[in-house]
């Protein structure tokens, strides 16, 4: 594997980009998560950033990447509708791991959005997608631009949903390299990592939540439900950040 040229790859059609990265991905699949991070820092261009929703297993990728690249900017897109426990979890992890947290929000406040558009999350798939565009996608795009990001780490795993089962370790999204170091981890591996390093799940995990986002589009897991059905009323899994 060798240093990759982001500009040259961005000039290719999407299908050709995937093919161009296929050999590299085949090699990355053989590496453990820490080696994937180290390889990326050596072979992919900076600036480097890590995104986190501070969800159920967030401590894993935050600890994993931050211990190899201390002070890496950690991007949080705050919708204003996170659970109180999530905000407390953010504070606790930021303090424990000494995170370089960068919080981005929509240009319109939550109250202003409701006045203008109503409760978008109650307006079907189109409403949810508009809500996500305003509160997740635009702030993330702004963060990547502000921080001059060229390589973006994220903690997605294939096991989490059907929409993630075929994701590679390395891809290009929003014009930057995107690296998923723990993409092939299962729930047991996550648990073992947390135990080994004295880290905790999100507080709501103990109350039956498998995935945590906004208060109005997250529900507890119940027997017979897939994890992805606990978000966005089962209408969709992704918030928009990891699509496209």
From Swiss-Prot:
Any one GO MF annotation of this record: phosphoadenylyl-sulfate reductase (thioredoxin) activity
Known catalytic reactions: [thioredoxin]-disulfide + sulfite + adenosine 3',5'-bisphosphate + 2 H(+) = [thioredoxin]-dithiol + 3'-phosphoadenylyl sulfate
Main location class: cytoplasm
Gene Ontology terms describing biological process: hydrogen sulfide biosynthetic process; sulfate assimilation, phosphoadenylyl sulfate reduction by phosphoadenylyl-sulfate reductase (thioredoxin)
Record key words, sorted: Cytoplasm, Oxidoreductase
Active-site residues, record numbering mapped to chain: 239 (nucleophile)
InterPro entries: PAPS/APS_Rdtase, PAPS_reduct_dom, PAPS_reductase_CysH, Rossmann-like_a/b/a_fold
A single Gene Ontology CC term: cytoplasm
EC annotation from Swiss-Prot or TrEMBL: 1.8.4.8
Compartments reported by the entry: Cytoplasm
Pathway connected to this protein: Sulfur metabolism; hydrogen sulfide biosynthesis; sulfite from sulfate: step 3/3
Domain of life where this protein originates: Bacteria
PANTHER family recorded: PHOSPHOADENOSINE PHOSPHOSULFATE REDUCTASE (PTHR46509:SF1)
Protein purpose: Catalyzes the formation of sulfite from phosphoadenosine 5'-phosphosulfate (PAPS) using thioredoxin as an electron donor.
Homology family: Belongs to the PAPS reductase family. CysH subfamily.
UniProt-recorded name of the protein: Phosphoadenosine 5'-phosphosulfate reductase
Biological source species: Salmonella arizonae (strain ATCC BAA-731 / CDC346-86 / RSK2980)
């Amino acid at each position: 594997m060798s240093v990759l040229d982001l500009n040259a790859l961005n000039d290719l059609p999407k299908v050709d980009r995937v093919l161009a990265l296929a050999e590299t991905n085949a090699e990355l699949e053989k590496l453990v998560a820490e080696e994937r991070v180290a390889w990326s820092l050596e072979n992919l261009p900076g600036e480097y950033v890590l995104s986190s929703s501070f969800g159920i297993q967030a401590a894993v990728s935050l600890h994993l990447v931050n211990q190899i690249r201390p002070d890496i900017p950690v991007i949080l897109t705050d919708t204003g509708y996170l659970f109180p426990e999530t905000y407390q979890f953010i504070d606790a992890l930021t303090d424990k791991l000494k995170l370089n947290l960068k919080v981005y929000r929509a240009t319109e406040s939550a109250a202003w959005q409701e006045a203008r558009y109503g409760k978008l999350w109650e307006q079907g798939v189109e409403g949810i997608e508009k809500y996500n565009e305003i509160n997740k996608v635009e702030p993330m795009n702004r963060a990547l631009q502000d921080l001059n990001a060229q390589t973006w780490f994220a903690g997605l795993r294939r096991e989490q949903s059907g929409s993630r089962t075929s994701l590679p370790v390395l891809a290009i999204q929003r014009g930057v390299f995107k690296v998923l170091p723990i993409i092939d981890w299962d729930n047991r591996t996550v648990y073992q990592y947390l135990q080994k390093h004295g880290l905790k799940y999100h507080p709501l995990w103990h109350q039956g939540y498998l995935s945590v986002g906004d208060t109005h589009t997250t529900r507890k897991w119940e027997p017979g439900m897939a994890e992805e059905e606990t978000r966005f009323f089962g209408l969709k899994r992704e918030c928009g950040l990891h699509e496209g």
